[in-house]
C-alpha cells in the first residue's frame, strides 16, 4: 500500500512538492487538481479568500477520503491532499490533490471523486473578501457540504 500525504497549512501550496511526494516509479500517471482563488463571484470582485478549519476533524476526514479512494480504486499508489488555511489571494492555490497510479484512468477518476468528497465532508470554511464598496466580506456555505442547508434541502436524509 502507498502513502497518504495530508497537510493543512498557512503557507503557500507548492504543486511541485506534492507532485514529487506522490510520484512513484511503478506509476504511469500522476493526476493533479489545483483549486485556486478566482477574482469574482456573483458579480462581485473577490480580492482574497480566508479559510478556517476544525483542523483535527479536517485531517481525520481527509484520511477517510484516502481510505475510500483506496477501496474504490485499488491500484492507487500515493495520495496527497494539501489544503491552505488563512489568507489565499486571487490566483493562488487553496487546495491541491495529487494521486499516482499505474494508469491514468484510475488517477483521473480518483482525483475528481476526491475533490467532490472533500467539498462534501471536510470541515473547512471560507470567507470571501470583496473589493471596497461591494459588501466587504461574506462567509460562504459550500452547497455540497453534507451539513449545509442547501444540501439538506436537495437530499432526502
Curated annotation (Swiss-Prot):
Localization recorded for this chain is: Cytoplasm
Q: Which GO terms describe its cellular component?
A: molybdopterin synthase complex
Principal cellular location given in the protein's record? cytoplasm
- Which GO-annotated molecular functions does the record name? molybdopterin synthase activity
Keyword Transferase appears in the UniProt entry? yes
One Pfam family cited in the UniProt record for this chain: MoaE
GO BP annotations, alphabetical order? Mo-molybdopterin cofactor biosynthetic process
EC class, as a word, reads: transferase
- Which catalysed reactions does the entry list for this protein? 2 [molybdopterin-synthase sulfur-carrier protein]-C-terminal-Gly-aminoethanethioate + cyclic pyranopterin phosphate + H2O = molybdopterin + 2 [molybdopterin-synthase sulfur-carrier protein]-C-terminal Gly-Gly + 2 H(+)
Q: Which InterPro entries match?
A: MoaE_sf, MOCS2B_euk, Mopterin_biosynth_MoaE
Listed EC numbers: 2.8.1.12
Q: Where does substrate bind?
A: 103-104, 119, 126-128
- Key words, A-Z: Cytoplasm, Molybdenum cofactor biosynthesis, Transferase
The annotated pathway is: Cofactor biosynthesis; molybdopterin biosynthesis
Its annotated function is as follows: Catalytic subunit of the molybdopterin synthase complex, a complex that catalyzes the conversion of precursor Z into molybdopterin. Acts by mediating the incorporation of 2 sulfur atoms from thiocarboxylated MOCS2A into precursor Z to generate a dithiolene group.
Q: Which family does it belong to?
A: Belongs to the MoaE family. MOCS2B subfamily.
Q: What else is known?
A: This protein is produced by a bicistronic gene which also produces the large subunit (MOCS2A).
| HAMAP family reported in the protein's UniProt record | MOC2B
Summary of subunit composition and partner proteins:
Heterotetramer; composed of 2 small (MOCS2A) and 2 large (MOCS2B) subunits.
Would you tell me the protein name for this molecule?
A: Molybdopterin synthase catalytic subunit
Q: Which gene encodes it?
A: Mocs2
Amino acid at each position: 500500500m502507498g502513502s497518504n500525504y495530508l497537510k493543512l497549512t498557512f503557507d503557500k501550496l507548492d504543486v511541485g512538492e506534492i507532485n514529487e511526494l506522490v510520484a512513484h516509479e511503478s506509476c504511469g500517471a500522476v493526476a493533479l487538481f489545483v483549486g485556486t482563488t478566482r477574482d469574482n463571484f456573483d458579480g462581485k470582485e473577490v480580492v482574497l479568500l480566508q479559510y478556517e478549519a476544525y483542523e483535527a476533524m479536517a485531517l481525520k476526514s481527509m484520511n477517510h477520503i484516502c481510505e475510500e479512494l483506496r477501496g474504490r480504486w485499488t491500484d492507487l499508489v500515493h495520495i496527497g491532499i494539501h489544503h491552505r488555511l488563512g489568507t489565499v489571494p486571487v490566483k493562488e492555490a487553496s487546495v491541491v490533490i495529487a494521486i499516482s497510479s499505474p494508469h491514468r484512468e484510475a488517477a483521473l477518476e480518483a482525483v475528481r471523486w476526491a475533490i467532490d468528497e472533500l467539498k462534501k465532508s471536510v470541515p473547512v470554511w471560507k470567507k470571501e473578501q470583496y473589493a471596497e464598496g461591494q459588501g466587504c466580506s461574506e462567509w460562504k456555505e459550500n452547497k455540497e457540504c453534507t451539513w449545509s442547508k442547501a444540501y439538506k434541502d436537495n437530499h432526502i436524509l
